[in-house]
A protein has these predicted regions:
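Alpha-helix-loop-beta-strand connector modules within alpha/beta enzyme cores
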Residues: 23-43, 99-113, 136-147, 201-204, ...
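Histidine-acidic metal/acid-base catalytic patches
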Residues: 1, 75, 132-154, 158-242
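Active-site-adjacent beta->alpha loops and helix N-cap segments on the catalytic face
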Residues: 15-26, 89
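Catalytic domains of carbohydrate-active enzymes, especially glycoside hydrolases
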Residues: 1-13, 75
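Short, acidic/polar
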Residues: 1, 18-22, 56-69, 162-171
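Active-site-proximal loop/turn and secondary-structure-junction residues that shape catalytic pockets
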Residues: 11-13, 40-43, 83-87, 121-125, ...
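Active-site acidic/histidine proton-transfer and metal-coordination neighborhood
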Residues: 49-151, 161
Length: 242
């Protein structure tokens, strides 16, 4: 036991039910919380939620219904949502209204179960053309949806590339942030391998009393056991303020 208290699995919804149940039992036995899994099929190359297409809305809501069952099976609270590609045929204001509309419907499905979808803005360098890329945009959407079941997944790696100014943006978005993910830049490996001052970022998050999960959605700078130990030691270095 090296001290990890949570576990993420983006592909959890695609796994066999028997494996989901086994993973849930193992996590429960070890006192590990389930983190995010991706709730739906993401449209990387063509418009989805931004389009306002009713068939695509229905498809998304059906994914959410299925994700609720998965969440209950694996004792998850959070699920990742990415609204998909921008719709170049529509003004951004109309696209935003379309996204808000369907997320309100999804929130109505999630609220009775105490579950939370977290919207993840993704940077334009790695994922060009997506509708949602910046934290203020996600904040505006979550404020408009106005539901405890619709919050922001603030991926520090993505937002360092897209907008920087990390601590001020985290502060401004704080009341709508439900989850964090981690990765340094460049390289998307563990903290201390890039330009982000994770000691200060973590210190700020801790100072706000955050009790949620910090998801390690990054690679290792070295392979094998040596790389795994370097990751652990990196996290020890950046949380020395505690």
């Amino acid at each position: 036991d090296l001290g990890f208290k949570s576990f993420e699995d983006n592909d959890m919804r695609k796994r066999e039910m028997s494996l989901q149940e086994l993973m849930a039992k193992t996590m429960q036995k070890r006192g590990i919380r389930m983190g995010v899994f991706v709730a739906h099929e993401i449209y990387w190359k063509r418009p989805n939620l931004a389009s306002g297409d009713k068939a695509l809305q229905s498809e998304f809501l059906n994914y959410i219904k299925k994700a609720i069952k998965v969440a209950k099976r694996v004792n998850a609270k959070w699920m990742t949502v990415v609204p998909g590609h921008v719709d170049l045929t529509k003004n951004i204001a109309y696209q935003t209204a379309n996204v808000i509309e369907v997320l309100k419907k999804a929130s109505n499905l999630l609220e009775p179960h105490g579950l939370v979808m977290v919207l993840e803005p993704l940077n334009f360098r790695d994922h060009p053309g997506l509708f949602l890329s910046e934290s203020p945009q996600a904040y505006e959407i979550c404020k408009s949806v106005n539901s405890p079941s619709c919050k922001i997944l603030f991926d520090i790696y993505h937002q360092q590339i897209q907008e920087g100014n990390l601590i001020p943006n985290i502060e401004k978005c704080w009341d709508e942030i439900g989850y964090f993910q981690i990765g340094d830049n460049p390289g998307r490996n563990e903290p201390t391998t890039g330009e982000i001052n994770y000691n200060n970022v973590f210190k700020y998050i801790h100072s706000r009393g955050y009790q949620g999960i910090l998801g390690m959605e990054h690679g290792n700078s070295f392979k094998g056991k040596e790389g795994e130990l370097k990751v652990i030691n990196a996290y020890k270095r950046v949380d020395k303020f505690i």
